UniProtKB/Swiss-Prot annotation:
PROSITE patterns: ACT (PS51671), BH4_AAA_HYDROXYL_1 (PS00367), BH4_AAA_HYDROXYL_2 (PS51410). GO terms for biological process: aromatic amino acid metabolic process; serotonin biosynthetic process. Pathway: Aromatic compound metabolism; serotonin biosynthesis; serotonin from L-tryptophan: step 1/2. It comes from Macaca mulatta (Rhesus macaque). This is Tryptophan 5-hydroxylase 2.
Length: 490
């Protein structure tokens, strides 16, 4: 069963005050060296290679302006300018004036050309020796949009998942000729209703409650009853832990189809995941992008009642019975999110590999517990026949290795030719982390849980922001450990 997936302009500063002619000899010499470096930057080198032309360097450097404040003392300026030389930042223009803030200080204006990385590193060093007064934004390469123009689009904030959710490849009302409900006009109209509900939903809204028909509830009941018999001996312990909680808090019963809004609120409290309605199949890229935000796209329609134990597509029985119980587990939730994060901005080829790994883990994965094979994949936990088959001697079971698993063919209408087993979710997560390192991407990403947005880690400044958050968390942990030690008398 196929899962439903599958950021200078150089604004001239008001230049007033005295010139740099008052600089000490050492400063004159340093300025001369900097000017010489700039003049020689376009000449041929010793090997006869031509310097880059203006057009060639336009995409590698931009004009930048910085104003910093120094104490009016001998040697202060030379120390600051030496940093420009060390970072190979070419100065185009430099001026000074008495500080408007403090009479004992001098403000230095520098108009220069450099690359983004060099400039960011320069600023970090200048902060230790000077006071940064102002920075002008850079030209050319410094716009984030231009940097990412060759990277496939991905949502940068959770509300942009609306765009992903509405890019449905195949609507739930468009049934194939071999679909059990193809000739049932009443069923087709019902499916259209669920499509309209999903397409009208936007982030932040409560999920519309559905009044399921008697036949839909009956179909749900058959699936619920038959699968419940197998779970004690076939499902992993994490599943068995959360299933009773869903019965208690979300109305998981044979005679009741749970509402997505109740399920979403439950998951939010347990693991930070939420669900949102979707009208049908999404591309692997759009579906995995949701996981990056801990959002699971979930169908609301129910399979045709003529064959309750079969569905050619993921329906709400598959989502609620297969996926939701494990999405309530924090470790499994993190494993799911990391697959999603790895997909953001990745190539089509890499996304397909990630989607295949998703298929054979989160959809059809097995794990070992107490020496026995147990199922954690939603495709298994929502399919009576394949759940029995996967844990039988007839099934081909292999150790999960993303490098080989991503090459396995995904089968939709028949049982899988192979299933992949992990010792634990933690082991599977670590293997996926190693595999994600092979994905070609000019940056890393970080999910900010406070703003529910994706931060692009591409320079020292962006990484510094994340480190600040981690340092705060680490301080909390250290404080807790110290209090424990005091309590225990250690």
């Amino acid at each position: 069963m196929q899962p439903a997936m599958m950021m200078f302009s150089s604004k001239y500063w008001a230049r007033r005050g005295f010139s740099l002619d008052s600089a000490v000899p050492e400063e004159h010499q340093l300025l001369g060296n900097l000017t010489l470096n700039k003049a020689n930057s376009g000449k041929n080198d010793d090997k006869g290679n031509k310097g880059s032309s203006k057009n060639e360097t336009a995409t590698e450097s931009g004009k930048t302006a910085v104003v910093f404040s120094l104490k009016n003392e001998v040697g202060g300026l030379v120390k600051a300018l030496r940093l420009f030389q060390e970072k190979r930042v070419h100065m185009v223009h430099i001026e000074s004036r008495k500080s408007r803030r403090r009479s004992s200080e001098v403000e230095i204006f520098v108009d220069c050309e450099c690359g983004k990385t060099e400039f960011n590193e320069l600023i970090q060093l200048l902060k230790f020796q000077t006071t940064i007064v102002t920075l002008n934004p850079p030209e050319n390469i410094w716009t984030e949009e231009e940097e990412l123009e060759d990277v496939p689009w991905f949502p940068r904030k959770i509300s942009e998942l609306d765009k992903c959710s509405h890019r449905v490849l195949m609507y739930g009302s468009e049934l194939d000729a071999d679909h059990p409900g193809f000739k049932d006009n009443v069923y087709r109209q019902r499916r259209k209703y669920f499509v309209d509900v999903a397409m009208g939903y936007k982030y932040g809204q409560p999920i519309p409650r559905v009044e399921y028909t008697e036949e839909e509830t009956k179909t749900w009941g058959v699936v619920f009853r038959e699968l419940s018999k197998l779970y004690p001996t076939h499902a992993c312990r994490e599943y068995l832990k959360n299933f009773p909680l869903l019965t208690k808090y979300c109305g998981y019963r044979e005679d009741n189809v749970p509402q997505l809004e109740d399920v979403s609120m439950f998951l939010k409290e347990r693991s930070g995941f939420t669900v949102r309605p979707v009208a049908g199949y999404l591309s692997p890229r759009d579906f995995l992008a949701g996981l990056a935000y801990r959002v699971f796209h979930c169908t609301q329609y129910i399979r045709h009642g003529s064959d309750p134990l079969y569905t050619p597509e993921p329906d709400t029985c598959h989502e609620l019975l297969g996926h939701v119980p494990l999405l309530a587990d924090p470790k499994f939730a993190q494993f799911s999110q990391e697959i999603g994060l790895a997909s953001l901005g990745a190539s089509d080829e890499d996304v397909q590999k990630l989607a295949t790994c998703y298929f054979f883990t989160i959809e059809f994965g097995l794990c070992k517990q107490e020496g026995q094979l147990r199922a954690y994949g939603a495709g298994l936990l929502s399919s009576i026949g394949e759940l029995k088959h996967a844990l039988s001697d007839k099934a081909c079971v292999k150790a999960f290795d993303p490098k080989t698993t991503c090459l396995q063919e995904c089968l939709i209408t028949t049982f899988q030719e192979a299933y992949f087993v992990s010792e634990s979710f933690e082991e599977a997560k670590e293997k996926m982390r190693d595999f994600a390192k092979s994905i070609t991407r000019p940056f890393s990403v970080y999910f900010n849980p406070y703003t529910q947005s994706i931060e692009i880690l591409k320079d020292t400044r962006s990484i510094e922001n994340v480190v600040q958050d981690l340092r705060s968390d680490l301080n909390t942990v250290c404080d807790a450990l110290n209090k424990m030690n005091q309590y225990l008398g250690i």
